[in-house]
UniProtKB/Swiss-Prot annotation:
<dbReference type="GO" id="GO:0003735">
    <property type="term" value="F:structural constituent of ribosome"/>
</dbReference>
<dbReference type="InterPro" id="IPR002583">
    <property type="entry name" value="Ribosomal_bS20"/>
</dbReference>
<dbReference type="GO" id="GO:0015935">
    <property type="term" value="C:small ribosomal subunit"/>
</dbReference>
<keyword id="KW-0689">Ribosomal protein</keyword>
<comment type="function">
    <text>Binds directly to 16S ribosomal RNA.</text>
</comment>
<dbReference type="Pfam" id="PF01649">
    <property type="entry name" value="Ribosomal_S20p"/>
</dbReference>
<dbReference type="GO" id="GO:0006412">
    <property type="term" value="P:translation"/>
</dbReference>
<keyword id="KW-0699">rRNA-binding</keyword>
<keyword id="KW-0687">Ribonucleoprotein</keyword>
<protein>
    <recommendedName>
        <fullName>Small ribosomal subunit protein bS20</fullName>
    </recommendedName>
</protein>
<dbReference type="InterPro" id="IPR036510">
    <property type="entry name" value="Ribosomal_bS20_sf"/>
</dbReference>
<keyword id="KW-0694">RNA-binding</keyword>
<dbReference type="GO" id="GO:0005829">
    <property type="term" value="C:cytosol"/>
</dbReference>
<comment type="similarity">
    <text>Belongs to the bacterial ribosomal protein bS20 family.</text>
</comment>
<dbReference type="GO" id="GO:0070181">
    <property type="term" value="F:small ribosomal subunit rRNA binding"/>
</dbReference>
């Protein structure tokens, strides 16, 4: 254990920052999981409300990821990769649901 007052303070600050960073990373993961679960739900049962929820959740996730990158919790390339993955997942789920809707219209029309 440190004996010098400034070293003791640095240990306290490091612990505080570690807990803050841990909470930020957990929030990013939770928001990403929410976007992914909403997009899979939309792919299974496409509804306009679900699409709006996806857009809102994606906006919140992007905002939190950008903030984590800005404060140094995440590396900027890691943040960019996570945002790209989320965007790709949402794009694929929306495209697959639109494709299935078009096929259903062709069958019934």
């Amino acid at each position: 254990m440190p004996r010098i007052k400034s070293a003791i303070k640095r240990v306290q600050i490091a612990e505080r920052n570690r807990l803050r960073n841990k909470a930020t990373k957990a929030m990013v993961r939770a928001l990403m999981k929410k976007v992914i679960s909403l997009s899979t739900a939309y792919a299974a049962n496409p509804q306009q409300e679900t699409l709006q929820e996806i857009q809102a959740a994606m906006s919140a996730a992007f905002s939190r990821i950008d903030k984590a990158a800005k404060t140094g919790v995440l590396h900027k390339n890691t943040a960019a990769r996570r945002k790209a993955r989320l965007a790709r997942i949402v794009k694929l789920s929306v495209a697959s649901s639109e494709k299935s809707q078009a096929e259903a219209l062709v069958e019934h029309g």
